[in-house]
């Protein structure tokens, strides 16, 4: 194999502009469109079904940040450890996923990921924004990708998200056949504008995400809330498969209104094909929440 030489300070300086290491950076977002298209000058990638992540790496620190600048360092520690081992000074943009048995990204498994026993984490990197003291955000996507490919070493957890030279419609049809979430179309000469929703980056969804069904709720010991989390599932071959807990985003008023709807649906029967382990300890919560479960007839979506 031909191994590309790592970019030197001189080659980066010729493309990027000098900039201090950024401690915070909002990702550039894509615009959702309905249909694939065929136009020259676009690069096509897989749309990963995971958590968008900015990785800030230098000799002193490693940080994994969500779209909302929440730290993923503890939550996704295998990715954090892998990036630390790379020993590069760079800012990367990508998506953390859990790969299922077929190698596809599984968002439900990612939401419930606590340790390696819950699935294999991968970090698919699709952009490089800063390297060795230089910002690459004013460099074209095509050039940024060349720098990324020659910067990132091969690693079992860290992967470069491939681009495909084909038409948008062909790639979209292939994505549907492979049961992928969708595709990304990015202008080859697009620059990186942090925090913006760009029309030079487009996302086209192939799989309409399943509507989840509520099969119960939990109440953690000592919690003043009406409920601590909802237990959600999706139907697969007419059986309700548990996909995870939804525990955030409910105001007290919303919880009150939901409890009124839950009341007539309360049942003693677990509606899921397997009983969810609601007290499973995690790395950040080694002590189980001591949650009690109330099952619901699976009528609410």
Task: Describe each region flagged by the PLM.
Residues 1-301:
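Catalytic cores of nucleic-acid ligases and guanylyltransferases
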């Amino acid at each position: 194999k031909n191994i590309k030489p790592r970019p030197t300070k001189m080659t980066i300086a010729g493309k990027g502009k000098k900039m201090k290491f950024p401690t915070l950076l909002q990702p550039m977002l894509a615009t959702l469109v309905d249909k694939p298209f065929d136009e020259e000058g676009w690069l096509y990638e897989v749309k990963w079904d995971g958590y968008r992540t900015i990785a800030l790496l230098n000799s002193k620190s490693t940080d994994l940040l969500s779209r909302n600048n929440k730290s993923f360092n503890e939550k996704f520690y295998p990715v954090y450890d892998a990036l630390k081992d790379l020993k590069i000074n760079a800012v990367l943009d990508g998506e953390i996923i859990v790969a299922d048995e077929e190698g596809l990204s599984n968002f439900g498994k990612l939401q419930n990921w606590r340790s390696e026993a819950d699935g294999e984490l991968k970090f698919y990197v699709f952009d490089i924004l800063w390297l060795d003291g230089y910002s690459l955000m004013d460099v074209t996507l095509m050039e940024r990708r060349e720098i990324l490919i020659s910067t990132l070493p091969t690693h079992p957890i860290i992967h470069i998200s491939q681009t495909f030279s084909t038409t948008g419609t062909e790639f979209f049809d292939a994505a549907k056949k492979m049961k992928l979430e969708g595709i990304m179309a990015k202008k080859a000469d697009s620059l990186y504008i942090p925090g913006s929703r760009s029309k030079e980056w487009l996302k086209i969804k192939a799989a309409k995400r399943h509507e989840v069904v509520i099969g119960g709720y939990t109440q953690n010991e000592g919690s003043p809330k009406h409920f601590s989390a909802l237990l959600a599932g999706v139907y697969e071959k007419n059986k309700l498969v548990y996909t995870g807990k939804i525990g955030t985003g409910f105001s007290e008023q919303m919880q009150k209104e939901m409890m009124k709807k839950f009341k007539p649906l309360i049942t003693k029967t677990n509606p899921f094909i397997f009983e969810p382990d609601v007290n499973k300890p995690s790395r950040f919560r080694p002590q189980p929440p001591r949650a009690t479960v109330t099952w619901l007839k699976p009528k609410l979506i």
